[in-house]
Amino acid sequence: DAIKKENPEALLLGETWADAHRLLAPDRLDSAMNYLFRDAATDWLAKDRISPAELDHRLNRMLSLYPWETALRLYNPLDSHDTERFRWLCRDKRRHALAVALQMTFPGCPAVFYGDEVGLSGGNDPDCRLAMEWDEEKQDKELLALYRKLIGIRRESPSLLRGDFRTCLCDDVSNVYAFRRTCGEDE
């Protein structure tokens, strides 16, 4: 309350490992780290623990916990200062690229932890907090280009910024998941 009195535009972001719907209210937090998103993406693409149908169930259940405007403010990480890095968990570059695409197109705010964009790897804490790799020769340039491209597309797309979310396909046999985002005429 004191922070909002001092600066009504201040963003209050909380960290919680569970769903945050009880913490997100006008008199509480504006947003929270959405580890439910991270866990679903990691379980499907990095750990191969769940099917597309289970992914869909988890993502839609998560979205149902919040009013839509709140869901659009959730902070969606693939990893963080407290988790193994996605690159460390998923050594398959194609699956990693799919995870980035999911993160950049899913409702909410994509949270890119430093180094994610260049493929920084690291296991459990403290390895997830390793120094940034500044040597461009050691950076994953393809991954960086993908991040730049998807961020550019997201910035220009009303559907990706505030559009609705509908599942189009869950194929457990082929391990395919597709969804659609629309906002007016934009999709």
Stretches found by the model and what they are:
Residues 1-69, 102, 121-149, 180-184:
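Active-site-proximal helices and loops of the catalytic beta/alpha 8
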Residues 55, 92-93, 172:
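A conditional alpha-helix N-cap/helix-loop micro-motif detector
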Residues 169-187:
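Carbohydrate-binding surface patches
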Residues 61-163:
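Active-site-proximal substrate-binding groove within the catalytic cores of carbohydrate-active enzymes
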